[in-house]
Amino acid sequence: MKRVHVIVEGRVQGVGFRYFVQHEALKRQLTGWVKNNDDGTVEMEVQGNESALQLFLDTIEAGTMFAKVARMHIEPRDVRSDEKQFRIMYGSGF
């Protein structure tokens, strides 16, 4: 089990990127959250099986027809054993 914090730069807001991220996470049974930041980046924390997580990150980095990822900053985080779902966060609150 592994957890990472990711900041994604590029054309990633207003193009359905958070929904794409959520779909790909759920498809791989990953948990965590994703949200838009005021600076135009998308931020997320994701955890799960290490191979599923790597496949998820590779897929996210490739983007979509509308979302273009320029750069991803990835840092390890402590695993949260209490987390059971992957959700889209709205606003600045958790």
From Swiss-Prot:
GO terms for molecular function: acylphosphatase activity. Its EC number is 3.6.1.7. The keyword Signal does not apply. Keywords: Hydrolase. Residues 3-90 form the Acylphosphatase-like domain. Pfam families: Acylphosphatase. It catalyses: an acyl phosphate + H2O = a carboxylate + phosphate + H(+). The active site is at R18, N36. It comes from the Bacteria. The keyword Transmembrane helix does not apply. It is an enzyme of class 3 (hydrolase). PANTHER family: ACYLPHOSPHATASE (PTHR47268:SF4). Belongs to the acylphosphatase family. This is Acylphosphatase.
